[in-house]
């Protein structure tokens, strides 16, 4: 059990430097008073009203610091599994990529949209468990997968520099609220193309696409229990062999069968 689950991003912040995506830390690691979130995120539950204050509300691990942490952990026989929260719990990343879009839109439109995680025309209405209304990546955008692969490749490079092998990346997958993607023209177009009738089923599309991205980069995927639940048999057949681990978190009375259901479906729990 010598594993550190490194949960470096969520709705409230992004806490790891990713070369080439400077906005993730320039914007996504800072919280404070703002009208447009172009320089920092809104304050959250624990405050964070000054984006320049040296408090827990602000800050991030530099690339060098994370590499040092990897080495330190390895010397003590601790394996670190990084998590990229997706497609939900992704508000910090989404806002950061909007800031990137606005920064480059007039001078370099291609660069502006290269890693976009949201669609300006999306009119979907939803509320997450934490009461966010804009924290889910648009899974129909090629730029979403470009973003995910970029982060995965940068993580891989950090592990290599630390003299280690990255085996898996935890992809999150939990708490995608009902109502997402229903008002997205791109998602509706994709659903029609692949024959889906319910927008929420696009979660399956996302995890199968990401499993392929991981495999292409020589990795297996991990995720919360949702990545292994409610799929078609065709999707299960693909995902079983590509999964490194499924983390069952919601096992309160009435849901305690989830662990057995997941294991019986052939996933490593």
Regions found by a protein language model. Give the residues of each.
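Residue-level detector of anion-binding/catalytic polar loops
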Residues: 2-3, 79, 220, 268
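Catalytic domains of carbohydrate-active enzymes, especially glycoside hydrolases
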Residues: 1-11
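Active-site neighborhood of glycoside hydrolase catalytic domains
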Residues: 125-245, 251-254, 259, 266
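Aromatic- and acidic-residue-enriched carbohydrate-binding clefts of CAZyme catalytic domains
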Residues: 12-75, 90-140, 179-198
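Domain-scale activation on soluble regions of proteins
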Residues: 79, 91-94, 237, 261
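Short secondary-structure junction motifs
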Residues: 75-77, 81, 164-168
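Anion (oxyanion) recognition and catalysis
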Residues: 67, 74, 215, 263-264
């Amino acid at each position: 059990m010598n594993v550190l689950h490194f949960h470096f991003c969520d709705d409230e912040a992004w806490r790891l430097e990713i070369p080439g995506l400077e906005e993730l830390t320039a914007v996504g690691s800072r919280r404070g008073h703002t009208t447009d979130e172009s320089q920092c995120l809104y304050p959250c539950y624990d405050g964070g009203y000054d984006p320049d204050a040296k408090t827990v509300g602000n800050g991030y691990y530099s690339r060098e610091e994370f590499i040092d942490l990897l080495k330190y952990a390895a010397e003590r026989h601790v394996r670190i599994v990084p998590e990229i929260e997706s497609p939900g719990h992704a508000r910090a990343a989404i806002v950061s990529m909007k800031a990137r879009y606005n920064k480059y839109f007039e001078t370099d439109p291609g660069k502006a949209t290269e890693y976009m995680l949201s669609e300006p025309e999306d009119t979907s209405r939803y509320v997450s468990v934490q009461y966010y209304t804009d924290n889910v990546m648009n899974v129909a955008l090629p730029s979403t997968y470009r973003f995910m692969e970029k982060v995965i490749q940068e993580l891989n490079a950090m592990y290599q520099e630390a003299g280690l092998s990255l085996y898996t990346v935890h992809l999150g997958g939990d708490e995608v609220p009902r109502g997402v993607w229903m008002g997205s023209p791109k998602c509706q177009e994709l659903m029609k193309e692949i024959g889906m009738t319910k927008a929420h089923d696009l979660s399956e599309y996302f995890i199968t696409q990401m499993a392929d991205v991981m495999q292409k980069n020589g990795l297996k995927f991990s995720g919360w229990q949702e990545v292994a639940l409610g799929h078609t048999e065709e999707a299960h057949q693909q995902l079983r062999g590509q999964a490194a681990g499924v983390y069952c978190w919601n096992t309160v009375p009435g849901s305690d069968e989830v662990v057995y259901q997941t294991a019986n479906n052939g996933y490593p729990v």
